[in-house]
Amino acid sequence: IRDSVFQAASVHRQHHDPRRIQLCTLMNIKEGGCSENCAYCSQSSRYETHSQASKLEDLENVLVEARRAKENGSTRFCMGAAWREVGGRKRGFQRILDMVREIRGMGMEVCTTLGMLNAEQAQLLKEAGLSAYNHNLDTSREYYGKVITSRTYEDRLETIEHVRNAGIAVCSGGILGLGEDESDRVGLIWEMSRLPEPPESFPVNALIAIPGTPMEGQPPVKFQEMLRTVATARIVLPTSI
């Protein structure tokens, strides 16, 4: 693993300034009530968890948080909404477009994660000034069906394609600790390497086993496994953050 970490660090230095980091702030603009059945997620309406369904945040509330984030040094503001897709939420989507425009007007980058998008919605987000869109694959194609069945792997790849075609940076990664094995972690990275362009960022998350979800009993992922996955991703996806 030491050799992998050394190689990963060397590759990273070839493509990025190792002395620079970007501070991002994430805000949940719509909590709970999601119709999806992602087995790890407290936001799903199918499980009894601590999350309570809420309405989409008002524009001004979001702008207050964005201003605070900028004052604290963040250069990117990310907004997440717990729902399956944007479709059918015209008023809510318009409010999100207004959020994107206003926050870009503050001089910040803006990222959203809003579930599935079609090509038109992706283009509207681009025109509003969206910098990046997060849509994780979660795990390998082979293991995916054991984590979620309400949305297909191809659905996720299609949204990523719409985002990329609109000229928005793609943020897409996965979660470790879902019960997958090493081959699934390799499979996830392999899927990313097959995209026409590598994602701008490849987040590697560790599962927080939340009571009430089907994965509440999963043990924490080991640090060495996390480190090995991050190192492998750096080597295979050298330009991704």
List PLM regions with ranges.
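Alpha-helix N-cap and loop-to-helix initiation/capping positions
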Residues: 54-57, 88-95, 148-155, 180-187, ...
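Conserved alpha-helical substructure of the radical SAM core
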Residues: 45-78
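Glycine-rich, proline-tolerant flexible connector loops at the mouths of alpha/beta enzymes
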Residues: 24-28, 48-51, 78-91, 143-144, ...
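Non-catalytic positions within long, well-ordered alpha-helices that form the structural scaffold/packing
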Residues: 67-71, 126, 164, 193-195
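Flexible, acidic/Gly-rich N-terminal and inter-domain linker regions that tether
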Residues: 1-40
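Active-site beta-loop-alpha junctions enriched in small/polar residues
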Residues: 28, 44, 82-84, 109, ...
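Conserved C-terminal portion of the radical SAM core fold
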Residues: 76, 81, 105-106, 154-213, ...
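Radical SAM/AdoMet-radical enzyme domain recognition
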Residues: 38, 75-77, 93-175
